């Protein structure tokens, strides 16, 4: 049976992550409060941020910046701003 969490990002009950993907207290908070769906949304934003801003994950400042963006996105409901990105419009 899948583990469910009350996802604070999506504001609904949803399937939880299978295991803690991020280290430390923040990782525990993500594991306990973020769903697989919300984590997937973050991963897409994270990839776009790394590419757009040419972040180097070996650089401590870049990792801190990305972690701050992740916390804002997952727990504070703030969208990640990516220069030049225009989301596709739904075509009905």
UniProtKB/Swiss-Prot annotation:
Coiled coil start-end: none
Cited InterPro entries: Fe_traffick_prot_YggX, Fe_traffick_prot_YggX_sf
Source domain of life: Bacteria
UniProt record, GO biological process: cellular response to oxidative stress
Keyword field: Iron
GO molecular function terms listed in the Swiss-Prot or TrEMBL record: iron ion binding
Keyword Iron belongs to the record: yes
Cellular component GO terms, alphabetical: cytosol
HAMAP family cross-referenced by the UniProt entry: Fe_traffic_YggX
Membership in a protein family: Belongs to the Fe(2+)-trafficking protein family.
Functional summary from the UniProt entry: Could be a mediator in iron transactions between iron acquisition and iron-requiring processes, such as synthesis and/or repair of Fe-S clusters in biosynthetic enzymes.
NCBIfam families: PRK05408.1 (NF003817)
Listed name of the protein: Probable Fe(2+)-trafficking protein
